[in-house]
Amino acid sequence: MNSETYWIISSNNWDLAESFGFNTNILETNLINLAVVIGVLVYFGKGVLTTILNNRKETILSTIRDAEERYQEAIEKLNQARTQLEQAKAKAEEIRVNGVLQMEREKQELIKAADEDSKRLEETKNLTIRFAEQKAIVQIRQQISRLTVKRALEIINSRLNLDLHARMIDYHIGLFKAMKTSAE
């Protein structure tokens, strides 16, 4: 029986169901019904839509603020990096200039030391030459003296005879006597 009742109810409602549907023709639809539906949607959906839009707006603004903060941080880091780069360039230039100056100082010191060594060597050479000259002069004088004495002895020995010898002795004795009388 249940199934018959169900059939009767459903067959009675079938006619009603055939008349239910959407009318897509805008001219045949009731504008009041549409206005009511839209009004209900606006009234009840306004809060939800406003909340969703506000949440979306806050999310976008938060994202923009975060992006701006990261942008500012990136700019600060970039400026710091540029400052450090400029400092590094300045330090490198200072090191280069100091290196060039140090190299120039060392070059001048080496030149000065080489000049001093050259002067010292020149003085040593001149002293050595003068010493060698003096030594040669002394040796030549000694040799000349020896040769002169030898030659003089040869001449004296060749000319010396008893008569000359006696005359020289007499001459020197006379000189001695003259010195003795002038001293008295």
UniProtKB/Swiss-Prot annotation:
The domain of life is: Eukaryota
The molecular function GO annotations come to: proton-transporting ATP synthase activity, rotational mechanism
GO cellular component entries: chloroplast thylakoid membrane; proton-transporting ATP synthase complex
| Chief localisation class | plastid
Q: Which residues cross the membrane?
A: 31-53
Q: Which UniProt keywords apply?
A: ATP synthesis, CF(0), Chloroplast, Hydrogen ion transport, Ion transport, Membrane, Plastid, Thylakoid, Transmembrane, Transmembrane helix, Transport
> Which topology term describes how it sits in the membrane?
Single-pass membrane protein
Q: Where in the cell is it found?
A: Plastid, Chloroplast thylakoid membrane
Main function: F(1)F(0) ATP synthase produces ATP from ADP in the presence of a proton or sodium gradient. F-type ATPases consist of two structural domains, F(1) containing the extramembraneous catalytic core and F(0) containing the membrane proton channel, linked together by a central stalk and a peripheral stalk. During catalysis, ATP synthesis in the catalytic domain of F(1) is coupled via a rotary mechanism of the central stalk subunits to proton translocation.
Subunit field text: F-type ATPases have 2 components, F(1) - the catalytic core - and F(0) - the membrane proton channel. F(1) has five subunits: alpha(3), beta(3), gamma(1), delta(1), epsilon(1). F(0) has four main subunits: a(1), b(1), b'(1) and c(10-14). The alpha and beta chains form an alternating ring which encloses part of the gamma chain. F(1) is attached to F(0) by a central stalk formed by the gamma and epsilon chains, while a peripheral stalk is formed by the delta, b and b' chains.
**Any other comment in the entry?**
In plastids the F-type ATPase is also known as CF(1)CF(0).
Q: What family does this chain come from, according to its entry?
A: Belongs to the ATPase B chain family.
Name of protein: ATP synthase subunit b, chloroplastic
Which organism is this entry from?
Staurastrum punctulatum
